[in-house]
């Protein structure tokens, strides 16, 4: 599915509206609750969902846009996906984007999982194993322990370790637990992401 939206729309509001139709945005920055969709397209590159859908500039994510030229006599122009590429991640330097046509995904219930790991090489290996497993993932990210130390208490917990952040559908949780067991590491299920007061969507 697709959605046509004006660039000043907040991504958090847009996602709520899409939920009414069983859809959601494919890609989100960590600032998705307060960022505008136009700002994300003009200055962003990827984020939550990139493990699944790649980056904003990858074919299929931005379907088209409208922009006003920045010359003496401004004109409103419409661009298809290929024509939109020069304006994608151009910070508005070659035109003022006024509306976007972007691809959406089926709305799923995503569950947030944190895995504690000691060695960085092992941490990378575990994440690679998770990304190649037959599970639906929306997020797969590593935070080194030095970064974790700067995080809020609710997130970093008591163990000083590297952390893998995952968002998976309910069906993938058991597989992730089995992978953790295989590598001898612990994991913690935070819960369904959109019902959490504090979720990992705000820390990546």
What positions do the PLM features span?
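Short, well-ordered strand-loop elements centered on a beta-strand within folded domains, enriched
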Residues: 3-5, 73-78, 152-153
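C-terminal substrate-recognition/cap domain of FAD-linked oxidoreductases
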Residues: 128-204
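FAD-binding subdomain of flavoenzyme oxidoreductases
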Residues: 11-12, 16-136, 140-141
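Extended, alpha-helix-rich binding/interface surfaces that flank or overlap catalytic cores
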Residues: 8
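Hydrophobic alpha-helical scaffolding
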Residues: 4, 116-117, 166-170
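Short, solvent-exposed beta-strand edge segments and adjacent coil->beta transition regions
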Residues: 2, 108-112, 161-163
């Amino acid at each position: 599915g697709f959605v046509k939206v004006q660039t000043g729309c907040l991504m958090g509001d847009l996602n709520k509206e899409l939920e009414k139709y069983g859809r959601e945005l494919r890609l989100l920055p960590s600032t998705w609750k307060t960022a505008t969709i136009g700002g994300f397209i003009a200055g962003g590159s990827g984020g939550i969902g990139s493990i699944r859908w790649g980056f904003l500039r990858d074919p299929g994510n931005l379907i088209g846009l409208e922009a006003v030229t920045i010359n003496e006599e401004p004109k409103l122009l419409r661009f298809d996906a290929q024509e939109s590429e020069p304006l994608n991640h151009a910070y508005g330097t070659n035109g003022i984007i006024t509306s976007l046509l972007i691809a959406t995904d089926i709305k799923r219930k995503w569950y947030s999982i944190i895995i504690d790991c000691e060695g960085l090489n092992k941490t990378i290996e575990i994440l690679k194993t998770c990304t190649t497993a037959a599970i639906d993932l929306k997020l797969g990210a590593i935070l080194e322990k030095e970064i974790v130390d700067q995080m809020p208490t609710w997130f970093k917990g008591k163990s000083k370790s590297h952390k893998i952040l995952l968002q998976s559908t309910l069906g993938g949780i058991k597989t992730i637990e089995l992978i953790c067991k295989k590598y001898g590491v612990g994991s913690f299920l935070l819960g369904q992401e959109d019902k959490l007061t504090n979720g990992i969507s705000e820390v990546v």
